[in-house]
Amino acid sequence: MYTLEKRVYRPPLEANSALLEVSLGCSYGKCTFCRYANGETPLQLLPAEILGDNLAEMADEDIRGNRMYLLGGNVLAFKAKYLIDVFQYVQSYLPQITQFSMYGRADDVLHKTDSQLESLRQAGLHMVYIGVESGNREILKNSRKGETPDEIVTALHKLDKMQIHYGLSSILGLGGQEMWRRHALDTADLYNRVRPDSIRVMTLTAMPGTPLERNVQNGRFKPASPHTILQEEALLLQNIRYAAHDCWFAGTHVSNSIPLEGSLLTDKQKMLVILKKAIKAESDQSLQQSDLKEW
C-alpha cells in the first residue's frame, strides 16, 4: 500500500479499525510544538488513483469490523461534500465499513454548518479526535494554537448537538516548569465542561526544527522536569470529575514515563495510586542524586 506518511499516527482506540490514508499535513501548521510548524508539509490530498489502488488492495484482504480511521492531518478540514464522497468511495470497495473517524481541529467543526455536520453524520462520520492541548488561554496563545478554550468548548458542544462522538487529547508539560499547575487545573476544567468518549495525554517533546525546540534552546521556554510532569498528570486526573459520564483515559503514549489507562468512572483511583507511587519514586531518586553530589 502506498502512503505519503511513513509513520502511522492513530489514537489507541482505533487499534482495531481499518486504516486509510487520505491526506498529509495540516491546514493550520503553526503550533509551536508540531512537526508541521516548519511549513514544509502543506495540507495535501492523496491522489485519487492512489486512493483507489489502496482500496482495491484492502478489498482483497480480510478486513473485519465496520470502522475505518482516515489517516492524515486534520482531515475534517476538507469540505463536507468531499468527505462524504470519500466515505462513499470507501464503501464501494468495502461495504462493511459504516463508521468513519478522523482527526480535526476545533475550528474545523466551527467552520461547518449544522446541516453539513448532520450530512456527515448520516454518511458515517462517527468519531472526531481533537487535540485541545490545554485549557489555559495563555498557554494556548504561547503555543500558537490559534484557538481559545471557549472556542474549543463551543465546537465540542456543537458535536454533542449533532450526536457526533469525539475523543480529546492534551499535552503534559505544555505550560513548562512555571505554569504546570495552572495548565493541569484549567485543562481539567475544560474536560469537565464537555463529554468526550476518551481523553489521551502525551508528554511534550521538543521535536527538531520546531519553534518549541528553538524556544527551549534560547531559554524562552523552560521544560517541566520529569517529576513535575508526573505531578501535573496526577493533578489533572484528580480534577477530572465525571459523575455519570464514562470516559476512557489513556496515558499510554510512548512519550509518557508511566503508561496507564482505564475508565474514569471505575479506574481513576487505581491510576492515581500508580502516579503517586511514581512521584514518590522520582522524589526519592532526586534526593539520592542530591546526596551523591553533596558527598
For each of these PLM feature ranges, what is it?
Residues 2-14, 192-295:
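Auxiliary Fe-S-binding modules of radical SAM enzymes
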Residues 4-53:
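Canonical Radical SAM [4Fe-4S] cluster-binding loop centered on the CxxxCxxC motif
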Residues 51, 83, 113, 152, ...:
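Aromatic/hydrophobic pocket-lining residues that form the small-molecule binding cavity
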Residues 59-161, 165:
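Conserved SAM/AdoMet-binding glycine-rich loop
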Residues 115-117, 175-193:
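Catalytic cores of alpha/beta
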Residues 26, 34, 51, 70, ...:
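Conserved, mostly hydrophobic/aromatic
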Residues 34, 107, 131, 135-139, ...:
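Conserved strand-turn element in the central/C-terminal portion of the radical SAM core barrel
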